[in-house]
């Protein structure tokens, strides 16, 4: 049993402090996840609060058969979709989130500028992916969810997620190579 499930079980048994622990444990990652769909952090925070209100109102819906985090994120995903009804689906990933995944040994100004450019290019490459690809990249690399957990969030089989993850990585690699080639061509002109 994962920590989220254990805390939620305590909440179901009447320990109100457990809800505070759940909120503290998941609020930032859930808000960032929702923000990836709607692109407005303030609205994402409101939706995150709605997710926890749903947990209070619908206490018995989580069966405990799996990890709590995918259950929570699927509620967040559904609420984000409802919020965006009629809007285009685009996942936004902040440069700060992307920056954590790029290496940097030298904190010099030049390296910081190069890193920022790399972050912007990576962010643009991710934004150019199909929505399912953007979503799976976010869940894998920014939320560190397993294929099984992602399958629950995206309501697909684990095999579909495995295939989708492969295609998403290939597509992202293609986007990055394309951008790199365009950059080199511009430098040679």
Give the ranges of each region predicted by the language model.
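Sigma70-family region 2
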Residues: 12-13, 39, 50-67
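Structural recognition of an alpha-helix C-terminal capping motif at a helix-to-coil junction
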Residues: 46-53, 66-78
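Arg/Lys-rich amphipathic alpha helix in sigma70-family domain 2
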Residues: 60-63, 74-95, 115
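C-terminal edge and immediately downstream basic/flexible tail or linker adjoining helix-turn-helix-like DNA-binding
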Residues: 6, 10, 39, 92, ...
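DNA-recognition helix of helix-turn-helix
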Residues: 125, 133, 142, 148-179
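N-terminal module of bacterial RNA polymerase sigma factors
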Residues: 1-29, 174, 185-189
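Acidic, proline/glycine-rich intrinsically disordered inter-domain spacer in sigma factors
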Residues: 99-127
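Amphipathic, Lys/Arg- and hydrophobic-enriched alpha-helical face
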Residues: 23-41, 58, 126, 175-178
């Amino acid at each position: 049993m994962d920590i989220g499930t254990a805390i939620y079980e305590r909440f179901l048994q009447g320990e109100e402090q457990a809800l505070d622990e759940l909120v503290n444990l998941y609020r930032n990652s859930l808000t960032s996840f929702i923000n990836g769909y709607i692109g407005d952090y303030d609205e994402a925070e409101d939706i995150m609060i709605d997710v926890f209100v749903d947990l209070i109102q619908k206490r018995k819906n989580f069966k405990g058969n799996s990890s709590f985090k995918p259950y929570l994120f699927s509620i967040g995903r559904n609420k984000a979709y409802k919020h965006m009804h009629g809007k285009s689906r685009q996942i936004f990933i902040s440069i700060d989130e992307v920056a954590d995944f790029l290496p940097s040994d030298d904190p010099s100004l030049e390296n910081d500028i190069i890193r920022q450019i790399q972050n912007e290019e990576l962010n643009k490459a991710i934004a150019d992916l199909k929505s399912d690809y953007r979503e799976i990249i976010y869940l894998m690399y920014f939320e560190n969810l397993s294929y099984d957990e992602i399958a629950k969030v995206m309501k697909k089989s684990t095999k579909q997620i495995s295939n989708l993850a492969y295609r998403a990585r290939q597509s992202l690699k293609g986007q990055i190579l394309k951008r790199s080639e365009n950059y080199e061509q511009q430098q040679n002109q």
